[in-house]
UniProtKB/Swiss-Prot annotation:
Belongs to the Mediator complex subunit 26 family. InterPro entries: MED26, Med26_C, Med26_Mid, TFIIS/CRSP70_N_sub, TFIIS/LEDGF_dom_sf, TFIIS_N. Residues 314-325 have a biased composition (Pro residues). The gene is Med26. GO terms for molecular function: transcription coregulator activity. CDD domains: TFIIS_I. Its main location: nucleus. The modification Phosphoserine is found at residues 435, 458. The keyword Ubl conjugation does not apply. This is Mediator of RNA polymerase II transcription subunit 26. It is found in: Nucleus. GO terms for biological process: positive regulation of transcription elongation by RNA polymerase II; positive regulation of transcription initiation by RNA polymerase II; regulation of transcription by RNA polymerase II; RNA polymerase II preinitiation complex assembly. Residues 123-133, 207-218 have a biased composition (Basic and acidic residues).
Length: 588
């Protein structure tokens, strides 16, 4: 092979030369070279549609007896199938980003960069300082001023990533606790949970109450959670929903058991990063402020409530706050312990609104709620891109919004000759299921008509048993059946016996009914005109006008009259043998 890579069309031509019309391999070396070239070639969907290499490779895979070649071809077809189907393409990107060191912040999630809320650049040193806040309890109070300044920047219209602080601070931002929506149904795994019940519940005295065993078992760690890499170069970018920060928030959850802190009010707004679950969240948000589940009692809230933000949450903004989603905790609040929110310290006067805590202004939440209602088509398109990690509520039922879509064996691809594109066969399956119905009705009507005709005549009358008995296949079958019956010791006569008896009876009845077809014998003549007497005028009139057997013609046994100028066809023996008699007289 040359140094320059061959085009897909050239590789297709080589493959066609190496196989015959039935996809049998004639040149194994050439086929292996084409497979190797295709494994290294970054082929596109358009090239596959133009060359139809997938069909050729699949036909070769089916016909070949070389197991190694079949495995390589199947692996190649799988990679092409993932290229064509977006679902598989998304999963491949997710695996690649999870394994790469420089892209640990999860670029496989479908973020919407056109939304108004954009994350400010975050330095590695800043991130490390925030991790130090979690590790060193003694330094927490020293950094309240810096947190205040960051909160002021967010209120002034400079949205930045909401910082992660420990649970012991007076203003705990707990972005990794996900409460159930107030109607009791688990939310989508892509939603950013509101900071409620992340580390248990608080009693009236501010002390932390341990969550029940039910609540402990209801949490689920994502499958793709990895340990954070603070030195990763990808951390300098605006964060998106990623794997690294999930694990970082898991560590923060474990440390939260040591430092009690008041949670947010229940009505604090929830944020989400992905528009794919806006449909579910939109329906949940309508019931959230008016409906309370059975085990939850609306407790008195002594803290001041910001207007239009605290109790009425915004219905899932499509804009993505920079903080990525982390471990989900589906913990219902403790119904018996009313939550008391202490007065906030003087250092945090601007962080009272939960919309500011979530990282966006109330204006952006209103705009995002409008975008939610108009983004129904986007949510339908993105509905398939669900993550693998799903949440379980307290009853043990899988959350409806987080269920991975069931993909049956419907991803068989086909080539549409009209559009010349490769597409799945899912839309044609119900048509196929319905199509046999009219085809079944047509034979039924024909069969009914045939049955009506057959009922008029007996099947014995329609069957030519004589010809059937002379058939070699029938005779061999009957003899085989008789031999089987005799070998098995059966005393009853076989089918050939009944057939022979029937044919004998039929033959005798036919012979009895059949008569020979001959001429009538002439009586001995006593009156011979011209010999015994003279010819008279009456004799002449009889010859010309009347039938005179033996004189001007003859008669057969069936009553037919023949003159001497006609051919006579007889059956003298009654065995269908014909005796043809030529005319006695030929008149010119």
């Amino acid at each position: 092979m040359t140094a320059a890579p061959a085009s897909p069309q050239q590789m297709r031509d080589r493959l066609l030369q190496a196989i015959d019309s039935q996809s049998n391999i004639r040149n194994m070396v050439a086929v292996l070279e084409v497979i190797s070239s295709l494994e290294r070639y970054p082929i596109t969907k358009e090239a596959l549609e133009e060359t139809r290499l997938g069909k050729l490779i699949n036909d070769v895979r089916k016909k070949t007896k070389n197991e190694e070649l079949a495995k390589r071809a199947k692996r190649l077809l799988r990679s092409w199938q993932k290229l064509i189907e977006p679902v598989h393409q998304n999963e491949v990107a997710l695996r690649a980003l999870a394994g790469a060191a420089g892209s640990a912040n999860g670029g496989a999630h479908n973020c919407r960069p056109e939304m108004g809320v954009a994350g400010a650049p975050k330095s590695i040193h800043d991130l490390k300082n925030r991790n130090d806040i979690q590790r060193l309890p003694g330094q927490r109070l020293d950094r309240l001023g810096s947190r205040k300044r960051r909160g002021d920047q967010r209120d002034l219209g400079h949205p930045g990533p909401p910082h992660k602080v420990s649970k012991g601070s007076p203003d705990p931002l707990v972005p990794n606790a996900s409460p159930l929506p107030t109607n009791g149904i688990s939310g989508s795994p892509e939603s950013l949970p509101s900071p409620l019940d992340g580390s248990g519940h608080l009693g009236p005295d501010g002390s932390r109450l341990e969550p029940s065993d039910n609540e402990k078992h209801s949490t689920k760690i994502p499958v793709n959670a990895v340990r954070p890499r603070p030195s990763s170069p990808g951390l300098g970018k605006p964060p998106v929903p990623c794997l690294q920060t999930k694990a970082a928030q898991l560590q923060q959850l474990d440390r939260a058991d040591e430092s009690p802190g008041p949670p947010y009010p229940r009505g604090s707004s929830r944020c989400s990063f992905s528009p794919r679950n806006s449909r579910h969240e939109g329906s949940f948000s309508r019931h959230r402020s008016s409906y309370i589940p059975k085990g939850q009692v609306s407790s008195p809230s002594p803290w001041p409530q910001p207007p239009d933000n605290t109790q009425v949450p915004s219905p899932l903004p499509l804009a993505q706050p920079p903080t990525p989603p982390v471990r989900r905790q589906e913990l219902l609040p403790n119904a018996e312990s009313p939550v008391h929110w202490p007065e906030q310290s003087e250092g945090h006067p601007r962080l009272t609104g939960p919309a500011c805590r979530a990282g966006f202004s109330p204006d952006s939440s209103k705009a995002d709620s409008d975008a939610t209602s108009s983004g129904g088509s986007d949510s339908k398109k993105k509905k398939r891109y669900r993550p693998r990690d799903y949440t379980v509520n307290l009853d043990g039922q899988v959350a409806e919004a987080g269920v991975k879509p069931v993909r049956l064996k419907e991803r068989k691809l086909t080539f549409d000759p009209m559009t010349r594109q490769i597409r799945p066969l899912t839309q044609k399956e119900p048509v196929r299921a319905d199509s046999p119905v009219p085809t079944e009705q047509l034979p039924r009507t024909e069969l009914e008509q045939q049955e009506v005709k057959a009922s008029l005549q007996s099947p014995f009358e329609q069957t030519n048993w004589k010809e059937l008995s002379r058939n070699e296949i029938i005779q061999s079958y009957l003899s085989r059946q008789s031999s089987l019956l005799s070998s098995s010791g059966a005393q009853t006569p076989g089918a050939h016996h009944f057939m022979a008896e029937y044919l004998k009876q039929e033959e005798s009845s036919r012979q009895g009914a059949r008569q020979p077809h001959v001429l009538l014998p002439l009586p001995t003549p006593t009156d011979l005109p011209g010999l015994t007497r003279e010819v008279t005028q009456d004799d002449l009139d009889r010859i010309q006008a009347q039938q005179w057997p033996g004189v001007n013609g003859c008669e057969d046994t069936q009553g037919n009259w023949y003159d001497w100028t006609q051919c006579i066809s007889l059956d003298p023996h009654g065995d269908d043998g014909r005796l043809n008699i030529l005319p006695y007289v030929c008149l010119d």
